[in-house]
């Protein structure tokens, strides 16, 4: 077995598993496609892996979650005259705003989410390097990521939590004190926090359901899973006090 490939029903979200049956992250598939195309500008939501900025010689633009925001970011890059513009979402759905040439073949812009390009690019990466997909993935050295959500989480409580965390640095520091110290923050979509030890935690209310989502990154899978549990516990504790 070399790989398992599939897609969702309308073919815009790819799935690629390695020789062990382990799925590769969607944002990694998008990054592999960027290398395949020789892209210069990557547009991707804030929920895609934070290691993308250091994974190659790209200019990276972060957006809110959703393909319309990625498309808007690509269009802005084109308007600025920037070459080699493409985008992808954390699910691996890939879009291109520029024309690319690969092995003498022109690939015209496809500014709508697609799964076929990242699947082909990933299989090509394995074949060209004569490596297994697991080794191709390991070569990118992206932080380990995990995510989960709290369902039936009132929109009012989500709003109250976000307002509380954004109200002051001391509020945020006190909320996150059980897990670490704040280094940097981003509020592009929800609130993403880089901790001083290099880990990341991101709280984001769902845009279309009564859910609170939590995304984390760490140096190891076990650290990521532990941080995710802690993050969700912090949200639950806030919800209890807000009642």
Q: What are these language model-derived features?
A:
Residues 1-19:
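N-terminal small/polar loop signature for handling phosphorylated ligands or for N-terminal nucleophile
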Residues 31-39:
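A conserved helix-loop-strand patch within extracytoplasmic ligand-binding domains
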Residues 7-9, 22-28, 108-115:
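Short glycine/threonine-rich catalytic loop with a Thr-x-Gly-x-Asp
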Residues 39-207, 211-215, 221-243:
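Phosphate-binding and adjacent anionic-ligand microenvironments
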Residues 22-25, 212-216:
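Short, well-ordered strand-loop elements centered on a beta-strand within folded domains, enriched
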Residues 13-30, 97-98:
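Short Gly/Thr/Asp-enriched flexible loops that form oxyanion-binding sites at enzyme active sites
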């Amino acid at each position: 077995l070399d790989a398992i490939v599939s897609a969702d029903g309308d073919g815009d979200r790819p799935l690629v598993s390695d020789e062990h049956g382990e799925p590769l992250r969607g944002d990694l598939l998008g990054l592999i496609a960027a290398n395949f195309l020789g892209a210069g500008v990557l547009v991707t939501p804030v929920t895609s892996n934070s290691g993308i900025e250091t994974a190659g010689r790209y200019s990276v633009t972060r957006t809110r979650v959703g393909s319309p925001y990625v498309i808007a970011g690509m269009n802005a890059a084109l308007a600025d005259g920037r070459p080699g513009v493409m985008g992808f979402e954390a699910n691996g759905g890939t879009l291109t705003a520029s024309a690319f040439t690969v092995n003498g073949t022109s690939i015209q812009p496809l500014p709508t989410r697609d799964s076929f390009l990242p699947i082909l690019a990933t299989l090509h990466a394995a074949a060209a390097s004569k490596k297994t997909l697991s080794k191709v993935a390991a070569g990118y050295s992206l932080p380990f990521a995990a995510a989960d959500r709290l369902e039936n989480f009132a929109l009012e409580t989500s709003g109250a939590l976000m307002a509380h965390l954004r109200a002051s640095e001391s509020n945020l520091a006190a909320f996150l004190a059980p897990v670490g110290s704040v280094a940097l923050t981003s509020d592009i979509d929800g609130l993403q926090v880089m901790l001083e030890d290099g880990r990341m935690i991101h709280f984001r209310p769902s845009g279309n359901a009564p859910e609170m989502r939590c995304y984390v990154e760490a140096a190891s899978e076990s650290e990521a899973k532990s941080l995710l549990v802690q993050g969700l516990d912090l949200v639950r504790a806030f919800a209890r006090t807000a009642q």
